[in-house]
C-alpha cells in the first residue's frame, strides 16, 4: 500500500514571512530576504494541522522554494517550533537553480514524490494551489491577508 503523504509549503504557509517581504519590493534582495527567515514567527494554525497529520501517520513532506544552502537554518527553525527532523522529509531548491516555484515543485512532485499517495497540500501561492488542484490533490489555501 502506498504511504499517505501531506505537502506543506514553508514560506507564507508554515512561516509568516511578512516582516521580510520589503526585501522583494523594487530591486529584489534575495540575500537579505533569506537571511532574515530565522526571525519568521510560526503560523500556529498550520502547525496544528501539521501535527495532526503527523499523529495520523501521514508522511509530512515540506516542499519549499528556499535554496538548499539554507537547509540548516530551516531545520533549526523547524526544531525551534517542535518539528523534529524524523517527522518530515524536506525538498528544497538546488543551489543556483532559478526556475519558477511552480516549475520546481511540479518537477519534484513528479520525480521524487511519486512513491507517495499525496492526500492534501497546504499552500499560499495561487499558481501552486492551481497545480495541486490539477493533480487532484485537495488544497488548503494558507495565504495571509496582507
Enumerate the predicted regions with their spans.
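Acidic, Mg2+-coordinating phosphoryl-transfer loop and its flanking beta/alpha structural elements
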Residues: 109, 115-146
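Alpha-helical substrate-recognition element adjacent to the catalytic core
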Residues: 2-99
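Short loop-to-alpha-helix "cap/lid" segments that border enzyme active sites
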Residues: 101-111
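A structural signal for short coil/turn segments at secondary-structure junctions
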Residues: 55-57, 113-116
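Short, surface-exposed linear patches
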Residues: 28-30, 82-85, 113-114, 141-146
